[in-house]
Amino acid sequence: MLQPKRTKFRKQMTGHNRGLAHRGSKVSFGEFALKSVSRGRLTARQIEAARRALTRHVKRGGKIWIRVFPDKPVTKKPLEVRMGKGKGNVEYWVAQIQPGKVLYEIEGVSEELAREAFALAAAKLPLATTFVKRTVM
């Protein structure tokens, strides 16, 4: 699973996930990309599940880039514990996603295969996504 090696603080406030993605919104490494259309949170498990779906479909061909990293801790109190007594323990890590954020990139495969692979990966994610190609200026 993806998670930071070390952080300055163990726990973070919930915060807001507003606005559009300006950074990480262009296809930078590969030819084709899976881009978010809606906002939400991706857990480390969801990112890994989609990555596995991608790599299994493209088999030996192509190179894949993961453009998101879960760097925000989400806490949860144990079951059947009364409210109060401080914030719960870190349960899992999430990446906050805004519309326009590139999630995965791929190169070295045909467009048809890339579309199929991204469709399988998108089924594992709780966000609406779209397929984009690299634009050469």
Swiss-Prot record:
Molecular function terms, GO-annotated: rRNA binding; structural constituent of ribosome; tRNA binding
GO biological process terms on file: translation
Keywords associated with the record: Ribonucleoprotein, Ribosomal protein, RNA-binding, rRNA-binding, tRNA-binding
Name of the molecule in the record: Large ribosomal subunit protein uL16
Family: Belongs to the universal ribosomal protein uL16 family.
Known partners and oligomeric status: Part of the 50S ribosomal subunit.
Role noted for this protein: Binds 23S rRNA and is also seen to make contacts with the A and possibly P site tRNAs.
Organism this protein belongs to: Azotobacter vinelandii (strain DJ / ATCC BAA-1303)
GO cellular component, one term: cytosolic large ribosomal subunit
SUPFAM superfamilies: Ribosomal protein L16p/L10e
